[in-house]
């Protein structure tokens, strides 16, 4: 009987140790990193508040391999990989879309800036394709240089007529080969690209507004009755 109890005790302890092993891991927990929109100064000139148009930012497209929550990196010999233990809070195109909307709204040069889910109509549509959003190790240094490139098309809502295209980019070298430094370089490169996007989008729409001035608003009806 004592022998059976001893065997049962050993079995319980073994099962407990096995179960404990199932719920413990030596792997570091995955870290989520985010980027902030740049503080864009309000440019001089531009469109007057009354003439300021509205803009909708369509859901961005991305080159193959980039639309993911992974922080992507490029290595020699045309290899693409990603950092383990790190992720963006959303797929990259969703994050870029939010940053574009925040940047354009903060400029104060638009009557309204809406994302792709807005139910309200807009005067212009901005379509962005992300060509690069990666940490580039192909130059041979110990730390990467982050590259961001955005291909932009602006069109009128009416008739879907394209009125301008441009490419903006930004690059920033990471101070060291450490995730915190690499994420900081991602933010610097993205800030440069978004700041340029804001300026060029405004220039394209301002030029279109000058070529096609809108009809002035109709005068408001007077509430006064004619004198008898």
Question: At which residue positions do the language-model features occur?
Answer:
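Short secondary-structure boundary motifs at beta->alpha junctions and helix caps
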Residues: 80-87, 158-199
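Bacterial N-terminal signal peptides that target proteins for export
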Residues: 1-9
